[in-house]
Amino acid sequence: MRAAVLREYGEALAVTDLDRPDVAPDGALVAVEACGVCRSDWHAWQGHGEWADDRVPTGQVLGHEPVGEVVAVGDGVDHLRAGDRVVVPFNLGCGTCKRCRNGHGNVCPNGLALGFEADAPGAFAEYVHVPAADYNATAVPDGVGTAAVAALGCRYVTAYHALAHRAEVGPGDWVAVHGCGGVGLSAVQLATAMGARVVAVDVDEAALDAAVDVGAVATVDATEGAVPAAVEAATGGGATVSMDALGRAETCRNSVDCLRARGTHLQVGLTTDAERGEVALPTDELVRWDVDVLGSRGMPPTRYDELLALVESGRVDPGELVGREVSLAEVPDRLAAMTDYETDGVEVVTEF
């Protein structure tokens, strides 16, 4: 099968031929129909994460946002059959531990990160293997398009879990979103669908325009002055919930500083080599104003049905964010384009 492999950090991925994965007794082999290209792939390609002992190994097949058709299942799989169309999370749970059984498979202690570790080769490939397939794979409704499902990837699922499950965003809340890339625009669209009012923050005019297109009621150009003051003015006192969707020190601090009393900061963006996993925050202010700081990773596999139902109903449309469909051969260049934020909306691999 054809696959895109990380050979050297920062060097073009090698698109090459590999053996098709074997099927484990509890696993499923999926023919990949589409796979989103994500900034987390860029972080992996750059070799980020060594400061947290989380560096993706060379030799890794990248890609972690697949949708496709089941072509084979192991003898221990009960709920999937060849021909089923499924979406696969990047945070794979074992399905049997206490966290998985209680709905927290996104932080399974025995879990695997699809496309980020050797035991879970990714989906920039013609085929991908899904372990614990009954637990991890979710059927896709017939009316939902392939590219739209791939766009859910880790951007919509990450934004949805953060907003709905961690911060419990509700009607009337003010939500600030710092960084209007894939995760940020997903958060704008989802928070709007939840009845919240959204302020979008970015340095790029086109990104802010895109945020308005998917529901933002106000925007802040981060190049034009103090972001926290601008958000406070737009919201009449500060955001109820604020998300750092980028992971830079500046966006993290701005997110915390723009909250009203008893607000909630959501950290979903991963840091770069500049921050190396650490950002200084005003802890005394967090205490003084009773502020919550929450991390959020992906989404439990068992809660995909909630998000797919939103998509099927038409309340959320991931297809709005898809800017380009590309081939597997183009993936090396599209990752390189992320270095200077030159991608075109959400980009999805649809030709293998």
For each feature predicted by the language model, list its residue ranges.
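NAD(P)H dinucleotide-binding glycine-rich loop of Rossmann-like/cofactor-binding domains
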Residues: C94-H178
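C-terminal substrate-binding/catalytic core of Rossmann-like NAD(P)-dependent dehydrogenases/reductases
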Residues: E232, A274-R324, D333
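C-terminal capping/lid region of NAD(P)-dependent oxidoreductase domains
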Residues: G170, V175, G236, L266, ...
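Glycine-rich cofactor phosphate-binding loops and adjacent beta1-alpha1 units
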Residues: A167, D209, V214-D292
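Residues located in well-ordered beta-strands
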Residues: R2-A4, A14, A31, V67-E69, ...
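N-terminal glycine-rich cofactor-binding segment
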Residues: V5-D22, R39-A72, V87-V88, C108-D119
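Glycine-rich beta-strand-centered segment in the early N-terminal region that forms part
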Residues: P21-C35, E50-R101, P141-G143
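Mid-domain Rossmann-like dinucleotide-binding core that forms the NAD(H)/NADP(H) cofactor-binding site
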Residues: D142-E224, A229
